């Protein structure tokens, strides 16, 4: 189990990313636009750098919904490998069966 503080920190990051997503996209569009002047690009880069560090989506970490474990995460199920195995053995995941050959 991950510490509650780590789970809360990750939740706070997700909220920050959602809050700044639109503004970040606008600034990045200005920076990537070849028709923008050099000054506009510069101002957009400065504004982007002044945003909080946690506003970037690359700072997010996928975590298991049940335990908060950051490694061995399966996106399709939102679970870590351990909890996914337990759920599959209980039959909680439709269509998922243990491999046998």
Curated annotation (Swiss-Prot):
GO terms for molecular function: rRNA binding; structural constituent of ribosome. Keywords: Ribonucleoprotein, Ribosomal protein, RNA-binding, rRNA-binding. GO terms for cellular component: cytoplasm; small ribosomal subunit. One of its GO terms (biological process) is translation. Transmembrane segments: none annotated. The keyword rRNA-binding applies. InterPro entries: Ribosomal_uS14, Ribosomal_uS14_bac/plastid, Ribosomal_uS14_CS. Part of the 30S ribosomal subunit. Contacts proteins S3 and S10. PANTHER family: 30S RIBOSOMAL PROTEIN S14, SMALL RIBOSOMAL SUBUNIT PROTEIN US14M. Belongs to the universal ribosomal protein uS14 family. Binds 16S rRNA, required for the assembly of 30S particles and may also be responsible for determining the conformation of the 16S rRNA at the A site. This is Small ribosomal subunit protein uS14. It comes from Pseudomonas aeruginosa (strain ATCC 15692 / DSM 22644 / CIP 104116 / JCM 14847 / LMG 12228 / 1C / PRS 101 / PAO1).
